[in-house]
């Protein structure tokens, strides 16, 4: 995978340990501290970028908002999800993510999300834009995704196995055939019942 990323022009940064013992699940957030990065998105390593993600990110860039957030599954109903946000350089005020995370829990399940909800969200909630397919009425500055969901129910943040097959339980059990709230559909596309 590393060689594929390099071939595509990705910059690879190896992390073998950090001062303050920042938990590994927080490492992906450290891009927010990098002064050489102007804009970034954080995604889980087991998800894949897709067109829906791309068009949402493009809409965020045009908006001028500091932080971008995605909620594209019924289980994404949180202020922020660990692998579905992004930002611009300088949008998260000092101290750095590394310093804040060093004082937070380590690699326990959900600690990354609790960190974002408790520590980062209060700092950025007024200068963020969220694309939200299910809970757009619960959080500030939320809006529908700019594209209709694919017929295969693919979603931003969807988990894939190492053979590139999607984890179908996330789709079949929670999304397939379940209409979303009309408030979370674009005004001119109320027919996007699985938006």
Regions found by a protein language model. Give the residues of each.
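Conserved donor-nucleotide/metal-binding helix-loop-beta segment in metal-dependent transferases, i.e.
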Residues: 20, 48-80
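Active-site acidic catalytic loop and adjacent metal/ATP-binding pocket
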Residues: 45
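Active-site-proximal specificity loops/subdomain of glycosyltransferases
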Residues: 1-39, 48
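Structured helix-beta-strand junction loops
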Residues: 8, 63-64, 122-126
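Conserved glycosyltransferase catalytic-site signature
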Residues: 25, 29, 54, 112-114
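Catalytic core and acceptor-binding pocket of nucleotide-sugar-dependent glycosyltransferases
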Residues: 69, 73-77, 84-195
